[in-house]
């Protein structure tokens, strides 16, 4: 699921570490995203988007102490889920407004 994100990373060591974190914590990551979005596909998209964001700018993630990296990912997933939820909510509001004008 995060193969696109892993492909962006230049270091094999970073790819292995991020892949291992993903494999060991996917259930937790999914639960965080699903709690906000209540939709399986949106939760999966959120996780992929969060890992891609880390891969595109890996410096801050790999600068964090090893024991805090999962918490770091949790925050990114939660924030990404908030953004997706707000974006979908805004689209829904616009659809309602458009429907009222017809």
Regions found by a protein language model. Give the residues of each.
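N-terminal module of bacterial RNA polymerase sigma factors
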Residues: 1-28, 35, 58-59
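Structural recognition of an alpha-helix C-terminal capping motif at a helix-to-coil junction
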Residues: 31, 45-52, 67-79
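Acidic, proline/glycine-rich intrinsically disordered inter-domain spacer in sigma factors
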Residues: 100-102
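Arg/Lys-rich amphipathic alpha helix in sigma70-family domain 2
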Residues: 74-95
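Alpha-helix N-cap/helix-initiation sites
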Residues: 15, 19, 40-44, 66, ...
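Conserved RNAP core-binding helix
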Residues: 21-22, 40-60
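Sigma70-family region 2
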Residues: 11, 51-66, 87-89
